[in-house]
């Protein structure tokens, strides 16, 4: 789980812990491989995956981040994609341009 501003990024498969949102005003962004997750992955192989943002969200600077897909690369396929999905989501919320992920290897 990662908290970015008032956004709480959680694993779709985990129980959401509202203690991290004391005022109850968090926007919950789910990450996982379920079809109803806010963020999911497709085309997973030994080199990377396609990051899929399935609904619009707001960045910390209040810019709209539209639904989109882009490739994320890694040097070794992880056993669990949630950490990568959550870090990439956090970076988007901090206004990192998705084009940056063309040159980053996790």
What feature does the model see in each segment?
Residues 29-106:
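Adenine nucleotide phosphate-binding catalytic loops in nucleotide-utilizing enzymes
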Residues 1-30:
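Flexible active-site lid/hinge loop adjacent to a nucleotide/diphosphate
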């Amino acid at each position: 789980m990662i908290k970015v501003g008032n956004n709480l990024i959680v694993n779709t498969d985990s129980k959401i812990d509202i203690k991290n949102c004391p005022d109850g005003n968090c926007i919950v962004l789910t990450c996982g491989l379920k079809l109803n997750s806010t963020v999911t992955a497709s085309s997973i192989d030994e080199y990377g995956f396609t990051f899929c943002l399935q609904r619009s969200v707001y960045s910390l600077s209040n810019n709209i981040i539209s639904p989109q897909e882009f490739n994320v690369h890694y040097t070794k396929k992880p056993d669990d994609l949630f950490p990568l999905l959550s870090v990439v989501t956090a970076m988007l919320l901090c206004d990192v341009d998705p084009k940056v992920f063309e040159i980053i290897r996790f």
